[in-house]
Each structure stands twice: as C-alpha cells, then as structure tokens.
Amino acid sequence: MKTLAGLVLGLVIFDAAVTAPTLESINYDSETYDATLEDLDNLYNYENIPVDKVEIEIATVMPSGNRELLTPPPQPEKAQEEEEEEESTPRLIDGSSPQEPEFTGVLGPHTNEDFPTCLLCTCISTTVYCDDHELDAIPPLPKNTAYFYSRFNRIKKINKNDFASLSDLKRIDLTSNLISEIDEDAFRKLPQLRELVLRDNKIRQLPELPTTLTFIDISNNRLGRKGIKQEAFKDMYDLHHLYLTDNNLDHIPLPLPENLRALHLQNNNILEMHEDTFCNVKNLTYIRKALEDIRLDGNPINLSKTPQAYMCLPRLPVGSLV
C-alpha cells in the first residue's frame, strides 16, 4: 500500500517538473547595460514627465446674482489735490504748519529766522527761558508770557516793540548781555511788570520805567551823572529793592520811595550826602522803618561828616567813616 502511494506521488512531481517553463539566463554584465552613470540622475527627474490629468486653474468667482463691481466712486480732482497737499505738508507738534506766518501754539511765535521761539528756548507754562543761546536780539514771545529770562546772550539793544504786546509780563531778566541802548518806551507800557534785572551790561542811560516795579537791579553797568532821570523812582510806591552797584553814579537818586527796604550803591563815585537824603529834617520824630539795608561802601564819601542824615534810619549805612 505504501509502495503504491509513493509511486503516485512521484508521478505527480515528475509531471509538474516537465510542464514548467524554462528560464532564460539574465546577463548583468556592464557591456550589455545601456544606461551610463552620467544619466543616472535623469532617471529620477519627473519635472518634464507629461501628466495626463488636466490642470485646473484656481480662481475666485463672484457669487451668482448681483455681480456689480464694488469700486469707490472717483473723487473730484480738486479734492484729491487738497488731500495730496495736506499729506505732503509737514506738521509740528501741535498740528500747525511751519509755513504759517503767525504761530500761536504751544511753541510760540516765530523768530526772525522763522523758527518757533519755544523750540529755540524753553517754555514752561507762562515762563520762557532763553539763557545762553547766543541771541543778538529778543525773540518774539508768546502773548501769555509772564516771566522772561534771556541771560548770558549777546543782545545789544532793547526795542520798544520787543515787549509791546505782553500785558501779562511780570519779570524780565537780561543779565550778562551786551545791552548799551534801550528805547524810551521799551518798559513803560507794561502794566504788570514787577521785577527788572539788567545787571552786567553796558547801559549808560535808563529809559522811563513803569511805576509798578518792586525790584530793580541795574548793577555793573555804565550809569553816570545823567544816566538816571530826575525823580525816576519817586512814584514807585511798591519798590522794595534798588540795586545800582558798580556804576559811575556821583549822587544818590532822589527822592526814594517810602517803602524801599534795600538800597545798594557800593562801588560808585558818590562824594556827598545831604541831611534830607533819607530823613525829613522838618519832622524830627520821623522814622524810616522799612529802609534797613543801605550799602555805600566802595565810594569816596565819608559818612561821618553827615551824622544827621541817618537819625531816622533803623540801621546805619555800610560805608567808610574816615
């Protein structure tokens, strides 16, 4: 039985082997291989291979229905020109144009060089500081200026129109300039002026001053015999401090206001003093309580020669007694 089964299995295997196709031998020799090494890179280049599929262009299509173009209406030519001009015009900090003739914003009016004063100087509220800017003239000031400082410059003259429209001006300080000339009406029409400082200049003559002044300092100038008008300080009822140090004065300017507290005249050329310079010779009980600070040192005057001139004073003047 086993012999018969083995015979059948052998016949099946032999039949399968006879019916199988014969395989040709494949030669991989380099001589029969057509592709060169230089063309190996092109075997994987798919850029130029045509694609059978149809290319689809992607675009945005307006929805069906109302497909009117949504373009804005053209602006009139004049309006466009104005808009272009407005965009091309530079603007300053406060929004105004630098080409405007009048500059009333926070930067103040324009100087003679067409430059805003408050860019050249420093403006804080109603105070304008123009110190040490090599100015040779007083710049145009904002109309609300109350305190003006222009020290250590090269200003040579004060014109009558420099402060003409500044009705709120209370203090002017022009220390250390080159001022030698002041127009007669430069200060007279300033209704609120309280303090005037012109020390360290070349002033030879004072103009008429407003009677509202409480503080005057014109030290270290060139005021001489005719440098101060007669009775220049008579009606200044609120004048408290008068500093005329380091000038060429040969007399004390009289009469002095009743409320004067300090009078500095040191380093002048004062030679004499009268008994009624400070006191009232007709009223021996008169006492001048306010005037406590008188400086006459540095003058050729001998204070011991006029003892009656100080009887009404709370303190003796400072000066030479020999």
From Swiss-Prot:
Family under the similarity heading: Belongs to the small leucine-rich proteoglycan (SLRP) family. SLRP class III subfamily.
Subcellular location: Secreted, Extracellular space, Extracellular matrix
Cleavable signal peptide: 1-19
Organism the protein comes from: Homo sapiens
UniProt name for this protein: Epiphycan
Keywords, ordered alphabetically: Disulfide bond, Extracellular matrix, Glycoprotein, Leucine-rich repeat, Proteoglycan, Repeat, Secreted, Signal
SMART domains reported for this sequence: LRR_TYP (SM00369), LRRNT (SM00013)
The record's account of how the chain is modified after translation: The O-linked polysaccharides on Thr-60 and Ser-96 are probably the mucin type linked to GalNAc. There is one glycosaminoglycan chain, known to be dermatan sulfate, and it is probably the O-glycosylation at Ser-64.
Entry function: May have a role in bone formation and also in establishing the ordered structure of cartilage through matrix organization.
Disulfide bonding pattern of the chain: 118-130, 279-312
